[in-house]
Structures are given as structure tokens and as C-alpha cells.
Regions:
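Conserved N-terminal beta1-alpha1 strand-loop-helix module at the mouth
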Residues: 1-69, 76, 108, 149, ...
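N-terminal amphipathic alpha-helix/helix-capping segment at the start of soluble metabolic enzymes
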Residues: 1-20, 133-145, 201-202, 208-209
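Hydrophobic faces of well-ordered beta-strands that scaffold small-molecule active sites
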Residues: 16-21, 41-43, 69-73, 92-94, ...
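Catalytic cores of alpha/beta
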Residues: 31, 71, 76-90, 94, ...
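Alpha-helix-loop-beta-strand connector modules within alpha/beta enzyme cores
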Residues: 52-86, 108-116, 141-144, 192-215, ...
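C-terminal helical cap(s) of enzyme catalytic domains, especially alpha/beta-barrels
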Residues: 58, 100-116, 228, 241-257
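Conserved anion-binding
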Residues: 79, 91-169
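Glycine-rich tight-turn/loop motif centered on a GG-T
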Residues: 89-91, 112-125, 184-198, 238
Length: 257
């Protein structure tokens, strides 16, 4: 069975580095990002214009490479979680996860029984993997073990509940949503404000206490380095569009002298 490489690295205490995509639709984006050296990429269905048919081919292609494909779904919903996993996603990232009940529902939707209530399915791309197991129970247990579940923390309510959220069995990562958190705190765009940083530190500390990984998704390299130094281990840098824009400007500046 295919190993979820970033989940394994996180379990081993290692840091993993990824990028979010919002415009790329060609399946080769997976291989391009793999060649660039990323551990994973995240398909953004919350803010970008992807639907289920758009992401299916990208997810299938990614499974032929060594990069891990994660999907940020639009909201916590059984159909989004189960169908995206059935299409080949190795991780589910849920935005605006604020409560313990929502964390438990994410686990219920994303895991087969007895850990959850995900409906049994063996998609075509998993047929060979299924044949590796004599017992169905062993197969479904293995799939559960390789599924990464990410709760995005981006409100004052979520910060207040973060210790309990990260204590939920099956939640692997608490991912910061710094922009939305700063908005909710009345400090829009001030990710480095002392109050915002203190709130983010609560997430890092809760994850450390409960044996989970913490992460962040922001464009600032210096900020990401700071939080890596504080113990964050799932580092999602910006978007593929920003990468192209920034590199393009850099190259043109050099060419024009």
C-alpha cells in the first residue's frame, strides 16, 4: 500500500514543506512540484475555482509520483471528505474548524469503522492495494492509518478550544489560518501583532502537549522560519501563482539590469 510520506515524516518528528495551488489544472503540476522538491501540495477548494471533476485527475496523477496530495475542502461535510478521499487525496484540510464536535465529525467522516463512519469503497486505483490484504478489515485499517486529517484554526473560538481539538484522536495537524484569525481578532493583516502571535503560540503549545503537529500557511518566508523555530512542522508556503509572479519579477529585473 502507498505510504503517506508526510504523515510518516510528521510522526517521526520531521518538518514537511508544501505549497497551495489555486489556478493550476494540468495534472503535471504534481510532478512539477515534486521535481521542485516539495513534500506535498494542497488543492484549494475553499477559495479557488476547483470542483470535484477538476481535482480528480490531479489526485490520480499525484499518486503516481512521490509527492503527497492534500485537499482543502470548502467546508466540513461528509460528502466532501469521503468523496475527496475516494478520489485519491491523502490528506483532508478543513477550514474554520472551531469546536471539539467538529473535530470529532472530521474523524468520523474521514475514517472507516471502528474509528469513524466513512462508507466502504474500493476505487479502481485502490484495487491492487486491496489485493495486498487477505482480510477487508486489515485493508480498511491500513487506509485509516495513511489518511491525514488537518484542522484549520482561524478564529478566537477555535483558539479557545484548541487544546481540546488537538486532543481528539485522529486529528493529525492543527493548521493556522493567520489571515482569518487576525480578522476575527480585529487586527486585519497583522499576523505579527503580539496578540495574534500569542494566539498562534497557544496552538503550537497545544499540539506539542497532545502529540500533534502544528503548521501555518502564509506567504512570508521570515514568518514561516520563525514559526518553524517555535516548533511548527507542516509548513505551507503561499500559492503557485505567487511563486510564478515573484520569480518572474526577479528574472526580469536581472535581465533588464
Amino acid at each position: 500500500m502507498r505510504v503517506n510520506r508526510i504523515k510518516q515524516k510528521l510522526k517521526n518528528g520531521e518538518a514537511v514543506y508544501g505549497i497551495m495551488i489555486k489556478e493550476a489544472h494540468n495534472v503535471n503540476i504534481a510532478e512539477i512540484l515534486e521535481i521542485a522538491g516539495y513534500d506535498y501540495f494542497v488543492i484549494d477548494m475553499e477559495h479557488a475555482y476547483y470542483d470535484m471533476s477538476d481535482i480528480a485527475d490531479i489526485l490520480q496523477y499525484a499518486r503516481k509520483t512521490e509527492i503527497t496530495a492534500v485537499v482543502r475542502i470548502p467546508r466540513l461535510d461528509y460528502a466532501y471528505v469521503a468523496k475527496t478521499l475516494d478520489m485519491g487525496a491523502e490528506g483532508i484540510w478543513v477550514p474554520h474548524l472551531d469546536t471539539v464536535e467538529e473535530a470529532r465529525n472530521l474523524v468520523a467522516f474521514g475514517k472507516y469503522p471502528p474509528e469513524g463512519k466513512r462508507g466502504a469503497a474500493v476505487p479502481v486505483f485502490r484495487q491492487k492495494e486491496r489485493q495486498e490484504f487477505k482480510q477487508a478489515a486489515d485493508y480498511f485499517r491500513a487506509v485509516n492509518e495513511e489518511t491525514l486529517l488537518i484542522a484549520q484554526i482561524e478564529s478566537r473560538e477555535a483558539i479557545a478550544n484548541v487544546e481540546a481539538i488537538t486532543a481528539v484522536a485522529g486529528i493529525d495537524v492543527a493548521m493556522m489560518g493567520t489571515q482569518d484569525l487576525s480578522l476575527d481578532m480585529g487586527l486585519p493583516g497583522q499576523g505579527s501583532h503580539p496578540e495574534v502571535k500569542a494566539a498562534i503560540q497557544r496552538v503550537v503549545d497545544a499540539c506539542r502537549k497532545n502529540g500533534k503537529a502544528s503548521g501555518n500557511h502564509i506567504p512570508g518566508i521570515d514568518e514561516l522560519r520563525y514559526w518553524t523555530g517555535q516548533g511548527m512542522r507542516m509548513i505551507t508556503h503561499s500559492y503557485e501563482t505567487n511563486l510564478i509572479i515573484e520569480k518572474g519579477r526577479e528574472v526580469l529585473k536581472a535581465l533588464k539590469g
